[in-house]
């Protein structure tokens, strides 16, 4: 490719609203162009990188037995109604009507669509298992699109779905796809982790995320520094904590505690560890057609993890869509006083009460007395009937691993893949069944598997690039080599550059010849910005000594290559990087 023919509209400065370096570099280097909030055009350089990522993905998925299909981007809303996700997904789901008044959605995921296909064409256990996947455009109407391709509204995704006759077969495919995803991310040269994760709006019985470690990541993962335990903070667990030695022994009594509304101030007032303070967190629960209140109790030195709390409510059959902060007015309406809420008589005030599992058998506690400026001491939860316990706290870095009891540590990360065991949920709601070996009708066991293809462009750059511009990995750079002519007016240099260009093309090198009539410094700046893996300089030294200066983009390391061994050395460097 000749640079003079390449459509790569580089900018002098990155967009002013760009925060992440990946967004800055992709826009400034002419990879992407934004045409709306969270909506981007992929220009030739980006398309080359996308093609390389997609080719790797196709190769690995098909090696693991998956079949490539292409499904409609537009889906009947009635299918989403049947699955129950039309309301659950919320405003991120874009719903529209056609000219005849029929409701459709722009799909963020396609569980409903693929289940409809399976229900119509897979009739017997003999056709199972089957794993179908696609790479296609998706749309999620993000309330605050940001960070370029990291949180876009329109994006490219690889999504796959598998159908099975039993849970054992699903388990095997879950592990098979996990292996395929590991190979894909290894091929892309990424440093990643596989972590236990929340199922979210997709649902199912189990899921794992594939996350890239980067300080700008949106997510926090909790990782053991000793064993292989790793989980998204939304579901991370810890081992049971040891009780502090200075237990505040007291008979049940009510004490005046003026202006002590936080767990920390209560602990300080009574000269005890926050561990013994019962912290109450009241949330407004949003259902499809109503709002209720729920109270969650944790120890005073713990914080509520809202995803865990929402899941705990739904285990109780709450069908909650989301949790919101309860206002002072919400509390006043049910007769509660913020900062003094406790378990005594609470059931008449709120619809749901859940205690963190760390409070089981808890005694010697201090809790709100449900009266302004009063707390109760000597609270023993064993004296209450039918309390509901669940894991609802956010794990802290000081907590210990649930597997080996060693210290846990936070890492910032960016999710690039997610795999789920859906079990029979979608099959039952959409009535997708087959005949088993005994001729009996059974619902499919399902799995679903996704990789954010367009997000991977940002993930690679967040992990690999520097302040100068894009640094791509071995298998993702738009070009392996850019040939830079020091003085294009020197016909000998120009002729030699074209000769080297042809020599490298014949050896299968993906090469770009910068034949533009611009300053040498500008060409080198574009090399740093765009991120070809190597720059090969044709200049006076080349003519005088038959030597080329070669610069690696990853670390800007320079070396001299002899003309007689040029192709072999270039191939050797490209293979080793």
Swiss-Prot record:
Reactions accelerated catalytically: tRNA(Pro) + L-proline + ATP = L-prolyl-tRNA(Pro) + AMP + diphosphate
Statement: the UniProt record of this protein carries the keyword Transcription regulation: no
Biological process according to GO: prolyl-tRNA aminoacylation
Alphabetically ordered keywords of this record: Aminoacyl-tRNA synthetase, ATP-binding, Cytoplasm, Ligase, Nucleotide-binding, Protein biosynthesis
Entry's localization field: Cytoplasm
Gene Ontology CC terms, in alphabetical order: cytosol
A molecular function (GO) term: aminoacyl-tRNA deacylase activity
EC number per UniProt: 6.1.1.15
Keyword DNA-binding: no
Family annotation (InterPro entries): aa-tRNA-synt_IIb (IPR002314), aa-tRNA-synth_II (IPR006195), aa-tRNA-synth_II/BPL/LPL (IPR045864), Anticodon-bd (IPR004154), Anticodon-bd_dom_sf (IPR036621), Pro-tRNA-ligase_IIa (IPR002316), Pro-tRNA-synth_IIa_bac-type (IPR004500), Pro-tRNA-Synthase_IIa_type1 (IPR023717)
Entry similarity comment: Belongs to the class-II aminoacyl-tRNA synthetase family. ProS type 1 subfamily.
Quaternary state and interactors: Homodimer.
Its biological purpose: Catalyzes the attachment of proline to tRNA(Pro) in a two-step reaction: proline is first activated by ATP to form Pro-AMP and then transferred to the acceptor end of tRNA(Pro). As ProRS can inadvertently accommodate and process non-cognate amino acids such as alanine and cysteine, to avoid such errors it has two additional distinct editing activities against alanine. One activity is designated as 'pretransfer' editing and involves the tRNA(Pro)-independent hydrolysis of activated Ala-AMP.
Domain statement: Consists of three domains: the N-terminal catalytic domain, the editing domain and the C-terminal anticodon-binding domain.
Protein name: Proline--tRNA ligase
Species of provenance: Helicobacter acinonychis (strain Sheeba)
Gene name of this polypeptide: proS
């Amino acid at each position: 490719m000749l640079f003079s023919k390449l459509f790569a509209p580089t900018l002098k400065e990155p967009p002013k609203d760009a925060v992440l370096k990946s967004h800055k570099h992709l826009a400034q280097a002419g990879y992407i162009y934004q045409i709306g909030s969270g909506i981007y055009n992929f220009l030739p350089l980006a398309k080359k990188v996308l093609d390389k990522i997609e080719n790797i993905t196709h190769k690995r998925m098909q090696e693991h037995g998956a079949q490539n299909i292409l499904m409609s981007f537009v889906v009947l809303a009635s299918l989403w109604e049947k699955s129950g996700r039309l309301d659950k997904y919320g405003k991120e789901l874009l719903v529209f009507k056609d000219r005849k008044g029929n409701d459709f959605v722009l799909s963020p995921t396609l569980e409903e669509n693929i289940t409809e296909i399976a229900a119509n064409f897979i009739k017997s256990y003999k056709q199972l298992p089957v794993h179908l996947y696609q790479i296609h455009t998706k749309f999620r109407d993000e309330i605050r699109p940001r960070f370029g391709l990291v949180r876009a509204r329109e994006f490219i995704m690889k999504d796959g779905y598998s159908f099975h006759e039993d849970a054992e077969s699903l388990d095997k495919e879950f592990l098979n796809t996990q292996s395929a995803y590991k190979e894909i991310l290894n091929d892309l040269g990424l440093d990643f982790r596989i972590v236990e994760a929340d199922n979210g709006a997709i649902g199912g019985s189990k899921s794992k995320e594939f996350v890239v470690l980067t300080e700008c990541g949106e997510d926090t993962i909790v990782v053991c520094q000793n064993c292989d335990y790793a989980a998204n903070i939304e579901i991370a667990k810890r081992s049971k904590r040891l009780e502090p030695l200075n237990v505040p022994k007291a008979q049940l009594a009510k004490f005046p505690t003026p202006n002590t509304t936080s767990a920390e101030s209560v602990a300080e007032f009574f000269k005890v560890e926050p561990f013994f303070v019962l912290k109450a967190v009241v949330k407004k629960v949003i259902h499809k057609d109503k709002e209720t209140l729920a109270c969650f109790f944790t120890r005073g030195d713990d914080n509520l993890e809202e995803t865990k709390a929402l899941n705990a409510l739904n285990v109780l059959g709450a069908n909650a869509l989301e949790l919101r902060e309860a206002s002072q007015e919400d509390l006043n309406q049910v007769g509660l006083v913020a900062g003094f809420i406790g378990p005594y008589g609470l059931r008449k005030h709120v619809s749901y009460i859940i205690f963190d599992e760390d409070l089981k058998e808890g005694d010697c506690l201090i809790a709100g007395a449900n009266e302004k400026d009063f707390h109760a001491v000597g609270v023993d939860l064993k004296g209450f009937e039918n309390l509901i316990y669940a894991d609802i706290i956010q794990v802290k870095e000081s907590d210990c691993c649930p597997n080996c009891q060693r210290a846990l540590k936070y890492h910032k990360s960016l999710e690039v893949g997610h795999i789920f065991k859906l079990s029979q949920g979608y099959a039952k709601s959409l009535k997708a069944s087959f005949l088993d070996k005994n001729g009996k009708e059974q619902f499919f066991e399902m799995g679903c598997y996704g990789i954010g293809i367009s997000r991977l462009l940002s993930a690679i750059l967040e992990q690999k690039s520097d302040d100068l511009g894009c640094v791509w990995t071995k298998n993702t750079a738009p070009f392996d080599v850019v040939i830079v002519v020091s003085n294009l007016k020197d016909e000998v240099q120009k002729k030699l550059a074209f000769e080297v260009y042809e020599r490298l093309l014949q050896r299968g090198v993906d090469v770009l010849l910068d034949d533009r009539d611009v300053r040498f410094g500008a060409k080198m700046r574009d090399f740093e910005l765009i991120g070809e893996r190597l720059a090969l300089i044709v200049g006076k030294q080349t003519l005088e000594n038959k030597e080329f200066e070669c610069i690696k983009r990853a670390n800007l390391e320079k070396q001299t290559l002899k003309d007689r061994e040029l192709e072999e050395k270039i191939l050797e460097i490209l293979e080793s990087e």
